[in-house]
Amino acid sequence: MRILAIDTATEACSVALWNDGTVNAHFELCPREHTQRILPMVQDILTTSGTSLTDINALAYGRGPGSFTGVRIGIGIAQGLALGAELPMIGVSTLMTMAQGAWRKNGATRVLAAIDARMGEVYWAEYQRDENGIWHGEETEAVLKPEIVHERMQQLSGEWVTVGTGWQAWPDLGKESGLVLRDGEVLLPAAEDMLPIACQMFAEGKTVAVEHAEPVYLRNNVAWKKLPGKE
């Protein structure tokens, strides 16, 4: 099985390829340069792996939340690639991707993900990983004021690992929560960490056709234009 993953939802730009268990990945910090960097990165990964788009089984994309512009760029490019090669698509949460990153780096199984959402809010989620490697908690994804995050944290207990830029943007976020918090050493999502999630979704048949691939902004006032003729 071969899955190509692309993410441009934050300041980072990343591409990764799952090739029957072998992972090739490229990660760059390139604010405002996503459109210039992402396609060369895709081509580099494919060339290095001796793979073409027609060899791929599915294309995973970072569906958000994150920068509105970044999410749009990522899904637009992913749709273009998938359309040309007639590939199904898999939308992967950027928040869950960071949780997977914390597990890869330090074995975290209980993760609090927070991305700075600007406008005095954070993109938030609480994840727990089961013994089969499946992450649970997608239903907790939301855009929240820090004080609401604090209320959510007070309903939890024990030790949790923190990931994302939200903890830097709001350094008091976890104070007086009653939780034991450890830094997961993951600030931004990476396509490499999308792959295990995407592989599981692919195995479960959770793919969508190109015209049905959509972002998840978590803010309801952002419109998304589908591909022409696919309304």
Curated annotation (Swiss-Prot):
CDD domains: ASKHA_NBD_TsaB. It comes from the Bacteria. Disruption phenotype: Appears essential for growth, since no null mutants can be obtained. Conditional depletion of this gene leads to enlarged cells, which display highly condensed nucleoids. The TsaB depletion phenotype is suppressed by overexpressing the response regulator RstA. GO terms for molecular function: identical protein binding; metallopeptidase activity. GO terms for cellular component: cytosol; EKC/KEOPS complex. It is found in: Cytoplasm. InterPro entries: ATPase_NBD, Gcp-like_dom, T6A_TsaB. TsaBCDE are necessary and sufficient for tRNA(NNU) t(6)A37 threonylcarbamoyladenosine modification in vitro in E.coli. PANTHER family: TRNA N6-ADENOSINE THREONYLCARBAMOYLTRANSFERASE, TRNA THREONYLCARBAMOYLADENOSINE BIOSYNTHESIS PROTEIN TSAB. This is tRNA threonylcarbamoyladenosine biosynthesis protein TsaB. It comes from Escherichia coli (strain K12). The gene is tsaB.
